Amino acid sequence: SSYAGLFQAKVKDKPRPDTHQVEAIEAVKSKLQSLDRGQMIMACGTGKTFTTLWIKEALNAQTILVLLPSLSLLSQTMREWAWAGNTDFDILNVCSDKSVGKKTEDMDPSDTPFPVTSEVDEIARFIKTPKPKVIFCTYQSSQLIAEAQLDASVPAFDLTIADEAHRCAGKA
């Protein structure tokens, strides 16, 4: 038997929006012309991660905040956006747990396969850069974003995506 096939990785084509995703993108674009916020609800497995990326691109948003409930979802979303994006953007990952990404008795930097920051000044500098940029941040670390934006010279985000927001919002 031959092992040659084991080492021939197929390069996946970048995904393209399905009909339901195109409809969602157009609906969000339309609503955001008259409203400053909205809610997109899609069933599990229907491509929310890519749909939000394509919304960012359709809106030509330059400074984006993506809030996520866990580091594992942050990692997955960041990787998928970086791979599937049709436009270049810089990435900053924010995590308030200062031990993440550092070698400790209980953790190795390889446990978190991407660099993170918990430094408010670094976050503020990143937001001020004149390039397209995305900050991926856990909900638990969002206070660091708020602190960075206390500086009046730090611009607002063009678009904020709060993934799984229903898990952290109360009912009125």
Q: For the regions a protein language model found, what residue spans apply to each?
A:
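Alpha-helical elements of the RecA-like P-loop NTPase motor core of helicases
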Residues: E26, S75, L144, G170
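Conserved helicase motor
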Residues: N93-V120, T138-L144, R167-A169
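Conserved two-lobed SF2 helicase motor
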Residues: K128-A146
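ATP-binding Walker
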Residues: T46-G47, S72
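Structured loop/turn residues at beta-strand edges in well-structured enzyme cores
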Residues: L59, F89, P130, P155-A156
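Conserved Walker A/P-loop ATP-binding site and its immediately adjacent core
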Residues: N60-N86, L92-V100, Y139-S141
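ATP-dependent helicase/translocase motor core
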Residues: S1-A43, F50-Q62, W83, T104-D111, ...
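SF2 helicase catalytic motif II
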Residues: Y139-S141, D151-A172
